[in-house]
Amino acid sequence: MAFRKNKKLNNDFTKVTISLASPESILEGSHGEVTQPETINYRTYKPEMGGLFCERIFGPVKDWECHCGKYKRIRYKGIICDRCGVEVTEKKVRRERMGHIELVVPVAHIWYFRSLPNKIGYMLGLPTKKLDQIIYYERYVVIQSGVKSEDGINYLDFLTEDEYLDILDKLPRENQLLDDKDPNKFIAKMGADALETLLSRLNLDELSYSLRHAAANDTSQQRKAEALKRLKVVEAFRDARSRIENKPEWMIIRMVPVIPPELRPLVPLDGGRFATSDLNDLYRRVIIRNNRLKRLIEIKAPEVILRNEKRMLQEAVDSLFDNSRKINAVRAEGNRALKSLSDMLKGKQGRFRQNLLGKRVDYSGRSVIVVGPELKMHECGLPKDMAAELFKPFIIRKLIERGIVKTVKSAKKIVDRKDPVVWDILENVLKGHPILLNRAPTLHRLGIQAFQPKLIEGKAIQLHPLVCTAFNADFDGDQMAVHVPLGHEAILEASLLMIASHNILNPANGAPITVPSQDMVLGLYYVTKGRKSTPEHPIKGEGMAFYGAEEVVIAINEGRLSQHAHIKVKGIVRTDAGELVEQMIDTVAGRVLFNLVVPEEVGFVNELLTKKKLQLIIGMVFKIAGMSKTAKFLDDIKQIGFQMAFRGGLSIGLDNIGIPADKNTLIDGAKKEVDSVWSNYLMGLITDNERYNQVIDIWTRVNSEITDTLMKQLEADQQGFNPIYMMMHSGARGSREQIRQLGGMRGLMAKPQKNLQGSVGEIIENPILSNFKEGLDVIEYFISTHGARKGLADTALKTADAGYLTRRLVDVAQDAIINEQDCGTLRGLTVSALKDNDDIVEPLTERILGRVSVHDVFHIISNELLVSSGQEITEEIARSIDDSGIESVEIRSVLTCESRRGCCAKCYGRNLSSGQMVGIGESVGVIAAQSIGEPGTQLTLRTFHVGGTASNITVDANIKAKFDGVVAFDDLRVIQSTNLEGDKVTVVMGRSGEIRIVEPVSGKTLLSNHVPYGAFLNVKDGETVKKGQELCFWDPYNAVILSEFEGTIQFDSIEEGVTYREESDEQTGHREKVIVDTKDKTKNPAIIVNHKKGEPKGYSIPVGAHLAVEDGQDVKPGQVLVKIPRSVGKTRDITGGLPRVTELFEARNPSNPAVVSEIDGIVTYGAIKRGNREIFIESKDGVKKRYMVPLSKHILVQDNDFIRSGNPLTDGAITPSDILSIKGPTAVQEYLVNEIQEVYRLQGVKINDKHIEIIVRQMMQKVQIIEAGDTSFLTNQAVDRFKFREENDNILDKKVVVECGDSEKLRPGMIITARQLRDENSSLKRKDQRLVVVRDAEPAVSMPTLQGITQASLDTESFISAASFQETTKVLSEAAVRGKVDFLKGLKENVIVGHLIPAGTGQRVFNDIIVGSKEEYDSLIASKEAFNAARKGELQQS
């Protein structure tokens, strides 16, 4: 037993290795064997000797005092008492000393046979069920068949007890006396003992070789897969051998380590009871069973009893290691499963997440916050009592320094008495000592900021109103925590990096986040809003001209000039070119007051200030005037805002809300329209679904008309000085939606529905016609309650989802740090303005701003250089690129960055929170995760303000010309037909057709639109059209299938009750045939049109379609055969948004994926097999692909259509993995970025692309091996792409030995260099022996993969980071088998081991830097030079 006196862990280790513990290493770390199950003596409360709390093994219970009390005091330090054998030392050693239990029989470790992949099972090639039979002593297993091999008994055969005894009887006597190594001896065992023997006899290299051979050459796919699974485990052990000794037989336990007693305490409660850790119970069971087994073996008990006891011991050890894995877990009272060692690590309450990643912090306090409007940007108010407590040690030190007290104890008394001298000292201590304020939940880095404290009376912390947005704080009872940075570095970082006045921009999008809100905005809006004189309300001083701002202020103060008067004043204006010019300005008197605080280099701001305008102005001030002036500017506008809101006395009255006069006429009109839709329906002209959709559309339209009227009316009221209108228009409070409900009508509400996703809200078709001013009647109120409650319930549920998303994002991106200036890649992303139809969603300037260009970009016409390659695109450059008419620019992106670890500064571009290029060491991954996760919580909290009203999106059902020009058709198959009224119409039959509008002169395509199947054309090819003219229209509510020619209808497999059901409308009595899903897969409903002249043509019909024709009916070309109702008019709620974001980040396949074409080609329909329709696509070069499409899906292509690769054949969403395999990595990356952005855009949340790019980059780090070649990879293994490249480069130009000839060094299958081959062959040649035959080594082949963020986090290089994320036991057991080394490169693993994170000021580059003054350095250099010169002189003399 090793005795380590001072095992202090040195804290500058650079890597952590995990491996299996050998019995020897457990013994070495142990301080003694625990032999008794007793814990403590119930009378003396002293630990029992040899028990689980024994002092001899684990150390004394009291400092410097042995068990029997013979030695007390520190002077006997290190002595081992001769009476009780306890070492006299500190009691804290009971936290670190381990013990052990020596087991009589080995047991298997539950992690390695219960969790998948089953390590022991794969090593031996045994299935889990059979393995259990061995481990739990049900069967014998043959380890060596020996002489019995001729009787057909083979290695790894299973024997029942009878068979085993039978064989033993027939064996020759002397066989059992042979040595185990003798190949003739018959050996069969059971239990973990057998496994240990089997594992120790394995030859890993041979096993690996034979498995690789099987995986490469086996014909059966299943055996191939099996071999690969086994190879994974075998290779893991072989891989570990290169670093550390790691034997397979160590998965079997002979020694059980006993963790230190202080980590599993036993605490006496009052009333003579004890509270104990569950581990003590589990250990006790192991010891009791082990001792009983020992005794049974000594008294030579029968085999049956021994076997039972051995099995119980195995189960006891299983429960100790992992109790949650077992089916019959050991339970305490109240049927609660005991917490085993594994459970101590797992989950939110486990060691990793509870104690290593989130610790409680000393020097902290928390209190309620109140607003502090007179504070400066960098200040906060700290209650005196809190400050005195937080800074106690500092005060005590000063008290002793000043000689006021002599001892710490008396100083403490003074501080606790709160003597007046304490406040004096405290003022001094606080100078230049910032504190950190934090509001939970901390969703992004602005949730913790530093402030300079000001002492205040009272008990609440005062917070600056402008930082509330960043903290997401309000003053309705929020609490905040205060922390004190102690070290010099900490104080420096707090006051330079975290101080509130430096965090003006939001890292998510680079827009200012410290923007005035509520009262401040209202005040600023009010003061900068002008009004004209009217006879009843003359405005003082209207039309006056002033020489300067001071005159205006005097006039206002004297009461000669109203703040709202329109006046002329001389001021300095900033031109577009950025020069400041003096000129006369037409403005409003109040705006002059505002401009007094605007920094002069910005020029005169002549705007009506709303919240959005203020954000832009603050952004502009930040760019032009810099950070410190912006902070002062913010404080000033806060002052004006509050001041003016108070002066204006703005408040709401009931009369401020007017109800539009023509509300009732509009509603009556709508009711009439709805009635006519109903009568159409009752006559059977439209389906129920169409009726529903039309009714919803009517109400949506009327609602917005009423809202528009209401807004116009409010705006006209008192020249726009209606308080409610001002609040809404300025952005201070309230939205258009809310005002609509106050004065218009509440509108359509969502129907209660039982779907959790909330992706589609069906709408109740009777809207609420009243508004809140008129009051709702009972039924309207009742309908409203559902929406309101749903909003609140959603909020509660979604917050958790968003939080979990953030956690996964942080975990996947935590090691993305800027590690180098330039990775030197030549690749980039081509970006252009994002358009939705023709509305620009995001202009090119915004997408390229702050990025680095890949190439030189020249002006199209003048050919001047706009930006050179590798240069950051600033605001000016972006504007000039936009003005030059360049459509797209190739920019550097983290998606194409070639850095081995993290990414490089050039590919990342600008750091959004400072507006400068990003610095090395910035942890961009965490910033990205926070930027995406933080609005996620916002999105979820968006639903309940509007009170559950349904926002509806009306659908387009036509294409209008956006420009004047000439129409050109592309691939457009059309057919002439007549509609229901008998008029001639042109119907589109193809699905890939496009209408283009071409400029008549240059022939340039101005716009190209896809035309849906079944649309009616209003124009002809080559026709000239005007802007706004309708080109075509279609039925927005139904997708249709049309007949292509004249003929007679014949139904195929359309049988009532089997493939369709008659739905009769209760109201109309009309009966409709609706196709349903049938169990009988041979029945495939189709409509066949029998052509008068040619071939008949069949149309297969998807489930849910409505038939529009009868059997035997005559049809014309272009007539509708089938209507498939489109689900339109569904409300989009961000509830649908959050699961969508999750789905994209997890790279999950959507529930009904589309079948996608992999090649360009012509479509042909095949036969129908097993309920699937075959579709063939043949490309021009003769490649033919076959797709099986379920008949229940709607097929989007017709026979003989031309389809492009990556286009869907059926309806449904395209899966990301399809995009990856067909269009490649770049396409899938862009798809993910755009789709995720789309969800956030709908909510009006701006997130910069680069954040999402970083996460997507992390999802695409791995490649999948298709062919392993001669590398060490396995087929289907996921490998880091850089590792893959390295391994392939490594094997390049190497040779593989095919035949070794007469060489003694080389074996077949060895990989050697050309040099080794040359040397070996030349030496063989000299001896006239057979030469070595070789072939070139084959590199591995891989394909890019897309991993979900959870999978990517678990596959990270660092096992510590992965284990602290999810599936802790699985990650750790895998890592132990592999003997993994964690080099502590990411942030998370460093936090866990207690190091500084390798980012920012904690970069490892700074570790060895010595900080000194310039003078010292110069003097050192000078003296070194002088010394060298003197030395030189001496040498010359000698």
Swiss-Prot record:
Protein residues bound to Zn(2+) 2: 823, 897, 904, 907
User: What's noted on cofactor binding?
Assistant: Binds 1 Mg(2+) ion per subunit.
What are the annotated disulfide bridges? none
Gene Ontology cellular-component annotations: DNA-directed RNA polymerase complex
Cofactor(s) this protein requires: Mg(2+); Zn(2+)
The catalytic activity, as recorded, is: RNA(n) + a ribonucleoside 5'-triphosphate = RNA(n+1) + diphosphate
Tell me its EC number(s), please. Answer: 2.7.7.6
Pfam families reported for this sequence: RNA_pol_Rpb1_1, RNA_pol_Rpb1_2, RNA_pol_Rpb1_3, RNA_pol_Rpb1_4, RNA_pol_Rpb1_5
Q: Which GO terms describe its molecular function?
A: DNA binding; DNA-directed RNA polymerase activity; magnesium ion binding; zinc ion binding
| Biological process terms in GO annotation | DNA-templated transcription
Binding-site residues for Mg(2+), renumbered to this chain: 474, 476, 478
Residues binding Zn(2+) 1: 66, 68, 81, 84
Highest taxon, organism lineage? Bacteria
- What are the protein's UniProt keywords? DNA-directed RNA polymerase, Magnesium, Metal-binding, Nucleotidyltransferase, Transcription, Transferase, Zinc
UniProt keyword Magnesium, yes or no: yes
Q: What does this protein do?
A: DNA-dependent RNA polymerase catalyzes the transcription of DNA into RNA using the four ribonucleoside triphosphates as substrates.
Q: Which family does it belong to?
A: Belongs to the RNA polymerase beta' chain family.
Q: Could you describe the subunit structure of this protein?
A: The RNAP catalytic core consists of 2 alpha, 1 beta, 1 beta' and 1 omega subunit. When a sigma factor is associated with the core the holoenzyme is formed, which can initiate transcription.
Protein name as it appears in the record:
DNA-directed RNA polymerase subunit beta'
The organism's lineage is:
Bacteria, Pseudomonadati, Bacteroidota, Cytophagia, Cytophagales
Q: Which gene is the coding source of this polypeptide chain?
A: rpoC
